[in-house]
């Protein structure tokens, strides 16, 4: 079981220091020739791959969470608006009370005019029209809808906050694999050059500084691989060739998204709508209470008779102050604060996005330059291959290996440039809250 477990584990990269003793010239040259043949085969038959593209968007868990949260907010809004729709303003009040002493003693002639009863029952049906659906019902429904929409958007922003980090991590992991395989091939070249320099050092045909330079390059390459592909086996991999591309950005659509379509923009719009709606609700009439009513009263008189009477009227409460103009001024000021804050945020976002767009354009140019260099170096190697074969008296094996290594280094640089460009795009998408596939960025082959 232990053996099977070890076999199923991925083979990770581990650095090695090669020390050669008793080297022979023919063996060193054989290693060079074998490596040249291997590189020619790998370069002439590469594995062409598309540049890794992360379709930034919501995964299944994100989608399920957001749909569930959205449905809850919409259900909450529906229930609250239904409650408002059922609020007709009708209210029933009543009272029952008794008088222990049903008679009043008095010495004047008006004593008989005093109402005399043992108990009283009173019921009243009133219509509180101001506090009902019939007065500003549309605005009252809008108030709960806007409050829930604001909470829904803020919740959605929290739920989608981590997709950018995950996208960057996935993009980096894919590029690291291709970069790591290129470095691994370059490391194989350095191992052979290290062997050659050790042989030459034994023969006193080279100074220590050249050998140290190769060893330092080897250590740096091993360090890079240990960082990029510490948990992946990249030995004996083909050479992955990536087609160079250029990123086109629809800046008009990008600025429109920032101003109108991003979650932050929609949150600001909802906040402004809330302030507008609150301004409509803040009026003098809404602070009054006007209640038409119909009242029925029954009296148990002191002579044990029952008398009834009905009343209709209007009960009202009118404040002698009016604070609503100040409230509306405060709400207008709040809207100005919201707009000012949004303008500042948009300005900062556009500045940072502008820097990233400039970086993308610079990376586009650098990638095109590196792609041209790769193409020219490949043609140079093809041309030199025939020249080396026709040289009867031999040639400089170290120089030829440097040519292959230079090509690999150029490919490595281009892949790193393309990775940095992809990360810059993700940073823009994060800054402007793009969380789904979009047409703002378009990738074309050079």
Show where each model-derived region lies:
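A glycine-/polar-enriched beta->alpha junction
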Residues: 61-66, 71-95, 99-143, 156-160, ...
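Leucine-rich amphipathic alpha-helices with coiled-coil/heptad-repeat character
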Residues: 43, 80, 89, 155-162, ...
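Amphipathic alpha-helical coiled-coil scaffold segments and their short linker/junction regions
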Residues: 20-22, 42-89, 208, 232-294, ...
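Acidic, low-complexity, intrinsically disordered peripheral segments
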Residues: 1-29, 33-58, 63, 231, ...
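Intrinsically disordered, low-complexity segments enriched in Gly and acidic/Ser/Thr residues
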Residues: 269-279, 296-408
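A subset of solvent-exposed loop/turn segments in beta-rich extracellular surface proteins, enriched
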Residues: 28-60, 97-154, 190-196, 212, ...
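Amphipathic alpha-helical coiled-coil segments and their boundaries
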Residues: 25, 60-69, 130, 134-144, ...
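Charged, solvent-exposed structural "stalk/scaffold" segments
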Residues: 31-32, 140, 144-151, 155-161, ...
């Amino acid at each position: 079981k232990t053996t099977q477990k070890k076999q199923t584990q991925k083979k990770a990269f581990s650095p090695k220091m090669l020390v050669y003793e008793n080297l022979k010239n023919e063996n060193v040259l054989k290693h060079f020739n074998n490596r040249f043949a291997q590189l020619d085969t790998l370069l002439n038959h590469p594995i062409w791959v598309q540049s890794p593209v992360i379709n930034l968007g919501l995964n299944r868990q994100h989608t399920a969470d957001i749909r569930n949260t959205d449905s809850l907010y919409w259900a909450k809004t529906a229930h609250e608006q239904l409650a408002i729709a059922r609020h007709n303003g009708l209210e029933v009040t009543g009272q029952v009370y008794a008088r222990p002493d049903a008679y009043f003693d008095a010495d004047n002639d008006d004593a008989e005019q005093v109402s005399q009863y043992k108990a009283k029952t009173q019921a009243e049906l009133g219509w509180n029209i101001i506090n009902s659906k019939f007065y500003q019902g549309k605005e009252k429904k809008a108030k709960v809808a806007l409050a829930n929409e604001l909470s829904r958007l803020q919740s959605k922003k929290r739920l989608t906050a981590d997709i950018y980090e995950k996208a960057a991590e996935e993009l980096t992991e894919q590029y690291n694999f291709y970069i790591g395989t290129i470095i691994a091939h370059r490391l194989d070249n350095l191992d052979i050059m290290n062997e050659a320099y050790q042989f030459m050092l034994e023969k006193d045909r080279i100074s220590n500084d050249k050998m140290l330079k190769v060893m330092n390059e080897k250590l740096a390459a091993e360090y890079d691989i240990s960082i990029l592909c510490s948990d992946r086996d990249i030995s004996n991999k083909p050479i992955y060739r990536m087609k160079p591309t250029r990123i086109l950005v629809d800046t008009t659509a990008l600025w429109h998204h920032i101003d109108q379509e991003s979650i932050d923009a929609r949150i600001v719009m909802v906040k402004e709508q809330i302030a507008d709606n609150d301004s409509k609700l803040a009026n003098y009439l809404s602070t009054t209470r006007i209640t038409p009513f119909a009242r029925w009263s029954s009296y148990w008189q002191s002579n044990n008779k029952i008398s009834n009477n009905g009343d209709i009227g209007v009960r009202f409460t009118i404040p002698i102050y009016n604070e609503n103009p100040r409230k509306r001024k405060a709400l207008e000021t709040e809207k100005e604060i919201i707009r000012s804050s949004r303008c500042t945020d948009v300005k900062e976002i556009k500045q940072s996005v502008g820097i990233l767009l400039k970086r993308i354009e610079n990376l586009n140019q650098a990638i095109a330059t590196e792609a041209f260099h790769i193409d020219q170096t490949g043609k140079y190697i093809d041309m030199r291959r025939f020249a080396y074969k026709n040289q009867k008296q031999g040639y400089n094996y170290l120089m030829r290996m440097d040519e292959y290594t230079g090509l690999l280094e150029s490919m490595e640089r281009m892949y790193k440039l393309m990775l940095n460009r992809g990360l810059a795009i993700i940073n823009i998408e994060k800054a402007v809250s793009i969380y789904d596939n979009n047409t703002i960025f378009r990738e074309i082959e050079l």
